[in-house]
């Protein structure tokens, strides 16, 4: 497995492009509630490469010290038909989930989960990985806020933003974020 140099001129452009894409993705923002993110890694794995079963570090270095890793993500940059093997396998809540999604798809999962990358048997697997410290430390609180955010988006299709139901839901979401933080 090889890592791209994201400090080079071209690497900085790639890093900034990836960070902008994540910042503009409402589902990612609602699910992760990012407080801060680790440095991104762009990883290329060729035939014979993989990454064994492991759990991510509880803390990662950031500019001003360390951050807690609540969530991990893998953003797939290669189309699945361009390589064989290379599935991301996550063990979470007694289940094993294996995924090899399309280019541009992102898998967000608890950093506390055991996971691995199956051996790539042909072609090249290209991904971006990163870690998030959430504004909402507890997973169950993040899930409740995510559900309410989705409910708000659904209700917004049929209700004026200034309607009592939408204002109450907006107030409730904001107050829960304050409480959970």
Describe the function of each predicted region.
Residues 1-41, 144-181:
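Non-heme Fe(II)/2-oxoglutarate
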């Amino acid at each position: 497995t090889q890592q791209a140099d994201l400090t080079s001129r071209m690497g900085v452009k790639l890093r900034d492009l990836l960070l902008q894409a994540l910042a503009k993705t409402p589902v990612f923002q609602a699910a992760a509630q990012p407080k801060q993110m680790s440095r991104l890694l762009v990883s290329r794995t060729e035939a014979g490469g993989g990454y064994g079963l492991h759990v991510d570090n509880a803390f990662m270095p950031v500019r001003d010290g360390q951050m807690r890793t609540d969530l991990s993500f893998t953003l797939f940059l290669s189309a699945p038909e361009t390589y064989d093997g290379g599935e991301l396998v996550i063990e979470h809540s007694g289940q094993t989930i294996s995924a090899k999604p399309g280019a541009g798809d992102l898998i967000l999962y608890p950093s506390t989960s055991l996971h691995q990358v199956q051996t790539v048997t042909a072609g090249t697997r290209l991904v971006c990985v990163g870690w998030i410290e959430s504004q909402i430390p507890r997973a169950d609180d993040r899930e409740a806020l995510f559900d309410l955010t989705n409910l708000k988006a659904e209700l917004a299709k049929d209700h004026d933003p200034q309607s009592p139901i939408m204002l109450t839901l907006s107030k409730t979401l904001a107050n829960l974020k304050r409480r959970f933080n």
